[in-house]
Amino acid sequence: MASVQSGKMIVGLDIGTSKVVALVGEVTADGQLEVVGIGTHPSRGLKKGVVVNIESTVQSIQRAIDEAQQMAGCRIHSAFVGIAGNHIRSLNSHGIVAIRDREVNPADIERVLDAAQAVAIPADQRVLHTLAQDYVIDNQEGVREPLGMSGVRLEAKVHVVTCAVNASQNIEKCVRRCGLEVDDIILEQLASAYSVLTEDEKELGVCLVDIGGGTTDIAIFTEGAIRHTAVIPIAGDQVTNDIAMALRTPTQYAEEIKIRYACALAKLAGAGETIKVPSVGDRPPRELSRQALAEVVEPRYDELFTLVQAELRRSGYEDLIPAGIVLTGGTSKMEGAVELAEEIFHMPVRLGVPYSVKGLTDVVRNPIYSTGVGLLMYGLQKQSDGMSMSVSGSSYSSDEPKAPVLERLKRWVQGNF
């Protein structure tokens, strides 16, 4: 096998509650991504996005990686890894520094982002991303790219995302147990946004709802920047459990019934359509109308979308997203999900699938690959920025090496006092 060359190949690893997806992307001569390898395997060892069994998780990752390597014809050495879970926290913050040479340079941007992320967080959390929203130079607001601009004071408005220290450490441990290095850990809804949202939607205002197996992840964008993120601990696994309980069928059959026959809006399901439902033990299978199945599924989707709507209202952005809602993730594929969401949100809703990728497009243009493709696109952006510097995941990049914490603190004090 050929070795994966840094700068030519990018790997995304989506370690989800229901499945592990490994994607290998090759950077083409024109700077585009071509997906050349895909590996998927049922996830064992995670619950609601958090590792609960190291050995089972390692085995699932290894099998997905092996499959992707075989398809791509290369050996994988490192990957961009997604993270999700109810332990994710976020807040908006800002920082202010003096501009040393009256012209903003990369060091000034690094210092102001460091200042902005200097917020009090619990000891068991760590900063995952510091995502720049916009900058203020003196009294000039709305600056998106401050580099090279003149002024005496630089302010950054940022969205800070934190995660549980042990959750991220366990994910890294599992990946390294498979012989891989971790290029970066990325919030999964941020990755999905890279692959399914258009620039126009992010400018106008949009809410991404990524419905996975264990959690539903929310990201709100306005004026081209991320403004709010949240996690709701209800997703596809709850739908499967509802079917298993209501139909008294084993979980593996409930999952198959959900994927093949379920509908999120009962009025769209044909009353005359029937399905066979396997029973528990040696009991014979039973027949059930598809509409009766939909009546089991619809209340859970209704609850989920109502919780998303409540989060939108709590965030204060409900009236600031004229581009509406974009649903993605494996659980968003169900028939009737978009129609039910439109009834609840009273705004435009569409199904988001990855775009702007080449290669195995017939396969990856599917909501279940949104996070995986987004991880590739995130990696492509970092590679084009030199892969040399990331302020806890911010979009800012520099060719300068990252200084030690004490040295950065010393520079910050010198620059401000």
Curated annotation (Swiss-Prot):
CDD domains: ASKHA_NBD_FtsA (cd24048). The keyword Transferase does not apply. Disulfide bonds: none annotated. It is a peripheral membrane protein. Its main location: membrane. InterPro entries: ATPase_NBD, Cell_div_FtsA, FtsA/MreB, SHS2_FtsA. The keyword Cell inner membrane applies. It is found in: Cell inner membrane. It comes from the Bacteria. One of its GO terms (biological process) is FtsZ-dependent cytokinesis. GO terms for cellular component: cell division site; cytoplasmic side of plasma membrane. Keywords: Cell cycle, Cell division, Cell inner membrane, Cell membrane, Membrane. Belongs to the FtsA/MreB family. Self-interacts. Interacts with FtsZ. Cell division protein that is involved in the assembly of the Z ring. May serve as a membrane anchor for the Z ring. This is Cell division protein FtsA.
